[in-house]
Structure formats: C-alpha cells, structure tokens
Amino acid sequence: NETAQNSLLKVIEEPPEYAFFILLCENRNKILPTILSRCASVLIPPLSNDEIFEIFGSKNEFLAAYSMGNPGKFLSLSEDGEFLTLREEFFNKIPMLIQKKRTSIYPLCEFFEKNKDEKDTLFEFLTLFFGDILLKKNFLEGRIINRDKTETIDRFNTETTKQSVVSSLEIIAKLQRELGKYGAYALCVNDMFIKLWEEING
C-alpha cells in the first residue's frame, strides 16, 4: 500500500553502503512514481514450461500453464492440496451448465456459495475454462490452460457457439464487477449461472 511504500522511500534515498535492496512486484503500475524513480527496473521474463519441469522434476501441464511461467506459483500450487481438490470439484460440477433443465445448475450455484471464501480462485477457473473453449473454437489448442480436461472442453465446444462463449465471458466479467459494488454474493452468483445457462442453451 501507499503508506508502506512511503516508509521505504527514505531508506531507498539513503541506503547503507553495505546493502542492496531488491524489491519484487508483479505489477509496476502499483508502485509509486517516487519509488520507481529511485530504482533500476529489471524485467524477469516468465519461464517456459520445459524450464519449470526441469527445475522441479514435475510435468504437470496444467499447473505450468496456470502459473504462467512463475516458478514460485508453480511450487506453491503443486503443494496446495485444497487448490487441486477445489479444481476437481469445479470440473465435476461445470457440465451442469449444458444440461437441458435449468434446475440442473442449482448444485453449481451451491458449490460457488459454499466456497465463497475461494471466490477469486473459482472465478479464475470459470474465466480460464471459457477462455479455453474459445481457444478450441479458434484452433489454438496449444494455448489451452486446462490441458488435462480436454474431454470437458470438447463437450462444451460441441454444445456452444463462438458468440455464446464470448457472451458468457462478458457475463462472468460483469458479475465480478458487480460483486465489488453490491456484495450480494449468493444472488449475483445465481443470476450469473442462470444467464450462462440461457446463453448456452438458448
């Protein structure tokens, strides 16, 4: 935050001779200009999947793609059993969106409500999943994140149009914006899944 950054300013302006300070950030736009002007920026490029596999001796294609070249994130997620369990539950529930009865989405709504504390992760799963369907429709399978879930992606690819997938991504993005304004999580989630079901099933 801004207060913490300002507290660093004097130390950075007059550092002790024996020390170097290395500041790490994921988004330089969140760093105050007064801090940036006193630092030398070094961009660390993301690692390739093969480089991550070589470092950790693990060939989890999904985690490598999901981590987007960040080895620390790859390591953290590979050791996070709750994250992996949540993802499996998500993929067990998401096919309910292509069932022909609208009431089939209620267990999916309940799953999102039950895991409200993990809503950021769940919405990332949802966005990436629909993004993968769009990549499939555009013949860009090499960029798919959920590479171990191709059967589910293929099912949705068959049941959707390109326009319905684009519209679904817009519905998800709008819901995330509204959550920040209104905060009625259960109502917003239910409304979102109803709209997604209608978009997919006509």
Whereabouts are the PLM-identified features?
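Conserved amphipathic alpha-helical interaction elements at protein-protein interfaces in regulatory
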Residues: 13-14
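Conserved AAA+/SF3 P-loop NTPase catalytic/coupling segment centered on the Walker-B
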Residues: 1-9, 31-32
